Curated annotation (Swiss-Prot):
Record's subunit section: Interacts with the DNA polymerase catalytic subunit OPG071. Interacts with UDG/OPG116. Component of the uracil-DNA glycosylase(UDG)-OPG148-polymerase complex; OPG148 and UDG form a heterodimeric processivity factor that associates with OPG071 to form the processive polymerase holoenzyme. Interacts with OPG117.
GO annotation terms (biological process): DNA replication
UniProt similarity note: Belongs to the orthopoxvirus OPG148 family.
Organism: Vaccinia virus (strain Western Reserve)
Primary gene name: OPG148
This protein's name: DNA polymerase processivity factor component OPG148
Length: 426
């Protein structure tokens, strides 16, 4: 019988397989180790180890330089490497997250702009983007035929955010040390946090990456959220001294197994610290970490993609959309609106609050029932006032994990439907 750990490994193997063409060397190494594990465990798994990948970003980036070195004379383009989730937009014309292989929906105008850039030069292998705080910025553009600067200028004309860059001539052998690093970094005066610098010598394709940093451990006082958009909140890790440690998104928080009142490993830069992107210490399963973090953030929030959103009035909006009626600001308005339509009123009467709330959020029925069967609820006056997951193993299923992360929203809608039913039919 397949164990939950095996299922997790197989899920990761499948995800890496789908994204091989966009993988870096670390992801390829991880993929090959999982293929080796899968072959020894199950004999035949339908995929093979790879030595070379048609489009691996490692073909374009040398190993990171983290100690001072001499840089040769020549003309150079220096680019910032931003903190955030890295995505690749290629000739497949979809935005794919580097490493996970997950496709990501982007606005139509952004997709159109990316396609125009790709169509302008058949030598472009891919465009590299970073997503942070729900904002996109193009970080690099890989072309066999032209400088990324030319592509940046075109991308800007099409409305895409482009990076600051620096074009300079170095006339003699120069020591690239902390001082030079800081001078170049300060020239990139945009608001995006920068974790390293890449540079290209004129006439060469491969990027060199420079990252001077120090590892440190910091004590975590609290985990909170910061508003970054219309009902969009990013996790915020606060140290004992009140400083913020930068976090990419909810999944970054989960992978690192951050816990209040413990120490975490960080990469210290000149002006900020970054939560070190590694599978954190400890024996907690991913499901256990998800439960703990959601409990820490509180019942007022739910996981919404890479970020958190506040339950608030979001449930009312989704319910009115599902019922195809006018938007309502309060339950009183909702009851009045339902009373205007006999069809909607009959639907409310004949369908259980449980099923209507599930359908409203589009949860797959089988996965939803599996999750609910692993939970315990506290009910008062027919409303859910508290819930607790008793067995987190079911969260190994990514669909069930998504539903659980969103469950505070389900409870909000369920309680609204229960209230509406009482007012209409009792």
């Amino acid at each position: 019988m397949t164990s939950s750990a095996d299922l997790t490994n197989l899920k990761e193997l499948l995800s890496l397989y789908k994204s091989l063409k966009f993988s870096d060397s670390a992801a390829i190494e991880k993929y090959n180790s999982l293929v080796e594990w899968g072959t020894s465990t199950y004999w035949k798994i339908g995929v093979q180890k790879v030595a070379n990948v048609e489009t691996s970003i490692s073909d374009y980036y040398d190993e990171v330089k983290n100690k001072p070195f001499n840089i040769d004379p020549g003309y150079y383009i220096f680019l910032p490497v931003y903190f955030g989730s890295v995505f690749i937009y290629s000739k497949g014309k979809n935005m794919v997250e580097l490493g996970s292989g997950n496709s990501f929906q982007i606005p139509d105008d952004m997709r159109s702009a990316c396609n125009k850039v790709l169509d302008s030069d058949n030598g472009i292998d891919f465009l590299r983007f970073v997503l942070l705080n729900n904002r996109w910025i193009m970080e690099d553009a890989i072309s066999k035929y032209q400088s990324p600067v030319n592509i940046f200028k075109l991308a800007s004309e099409y409305g895409l955010n482009i990076p600051k860059y620096l074009e300079i001539e170095i006339e003699e052998d120069t020591l690239f040390d902390d001082e030079l690093y800081s001078i170049i970094e300060r020239s990139f005066d945009d608001k995006f946090p920068k974790i390293s610098i890449s540079y290209i010598k004129l006439g060469e394709l491969r990027r060199q990456v420079v990252d001077f940093f120090k590892f440190s451990f910091m004590y975590i006082e609290s985990i909170k959220v910061d508003r970054i958009g219309d009902n969009i909140f990013i996790p915020s890790v606060i140290t004992k001294s009140g400083k913020k440690i930068l976090v990419k998104d909810v999944d970054h928080l989960i992978r690192s197994k951050v816990r209040e009142h413990t120490f975490v490993k960080v990469k210290k830069k000149n002006t900020f610290s970054i939560l070190y992107d590694y599978d954190g210490n400890g024996t907690e399963t991913r499901g256990e970490v998800i439960k703990r973090i959601i409990d820490t953030i509180g019942r007022d929030y739910y996981v919404n993609g890479k970020y958190f959103s506040k339950v608030g009035s979001a449930g009312l909006k989704q319910l009115t959309n599902k019922l195809d009626i006018n938007e309502c600001a309060t339950v009183d308005e909702l009851v009045d609106e339902i009373n205007k339509s006999g069809t909607v009123k009959r639907k409310i009467k004949n369908q259980s609050a449980f099923d209507l709330s599930r359908e409203c959020l589009g949860y797959p029925e089988a996965d939803f029932i599996t999750l609910v069967n692993n939970m315990r609820f506290k009910i008062e006056n027919c409303k859910v006032v508290n819930f607790n997951i008793e067995n987190t193993n079911c969260l190994n299923n990514p669909s069930i994990e998504t539903i659980y992360g969103n469950f505070n929203q389900f409870v909000s809608i369920f309680n609204i439907v229960t209230d509406v039913k009482k007012r209409l039919f009792e």
